[in-house]
Amino acid sequence: MEPNTKYWNKDRMPSVRIVFDNIISKSDALKAVAAGDGKVDVVTMVTPSEAMAFKSDNAKIVMAKAKTVLVGVFNQNKPDSPWKDIKVRQAMNMAIDRKALIEKGEGGHAELIPAMIQPGRFGYNDSLKPYALDASKAGEVLKAAKIPDATVAIGAGEDQKALFDAMTEQLAKVGLKTKMVDPKGDDFDVKLVWHFDWSPQFPVGVVHREFFGKDGAFRAMPEDPQFDAMFAKLLATPKLEDQEPIVRDIEKYVYDQANVLFLYSPHTLYAVSNRVSFQPYDTFMLELAETKIVKGQ
């Protein structure tokens, strides 16, 4: 991509040529940015384990608190699914120590959130608190649910192995075993799903709808007429100041229903060469409008 010298905003005039390399492997890209030779200046989607292992005098890890969310989607579509019972879903939420998951599964690179929206963001409901850990109560409910073989199949990718191991350790305390299954299949009880809000101020349309709406890509439960009605009300409300109370109500509704295992908001990590000044965006989108070559480089 070449800089547009005719760009209308002189204060934000692009000044660098941008080359995207989607062929190079992640490991080679990290080695290249660490070398500082200018072949690679920014590596996106860096994992916590990669960030912890990254050492360089020529580059650094840049962290952004983007509008991301990681949840476990309960599979309510299975015949005789125990997750159709709201008490069982809530019990699973009470079985998890989220702070410990953040440390062991993400190396500390995440923010604790009660549901789907981060504190301070549009629609955040400050009346909500993350589900409190109560292993004793959770264990009683989950035992009574008679989950087949007392085993929870967790859909997770290899890059989520540390998180899976941390969840396994915690669920053992409430009498449950785990097994890791392909997240692309349907043979899961709980599937780990990462998503992000790329919108300016429309989290319900971009995030909540994907998990709970009738046309949601991640929905693994029967249609929820109550959620769809609340979403329709939001769509029929033109003024932003009138929308926010509705968003807060929707956030509380999905929290109470517990149709997902609420976890946290992962940080977005980049490996960035000292040659460039890089500004990450909180939408998670890779915007390079403010990226510049540092003088003297």
Regions inferred by a protein language model and the residue ranges of each:
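Short, solvent-exposed loop/beta-turn-alpha elements that line the ligand-binding surface or hinge
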Residues: 7-15, 53-65, 71-86, 122-137, ...
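Short, well-ordered beta-strand elements
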Residues: 15-22, 148-157, 178-179, 192
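Structural transition elements
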Residues: 94, 107, 111-144, 156-162
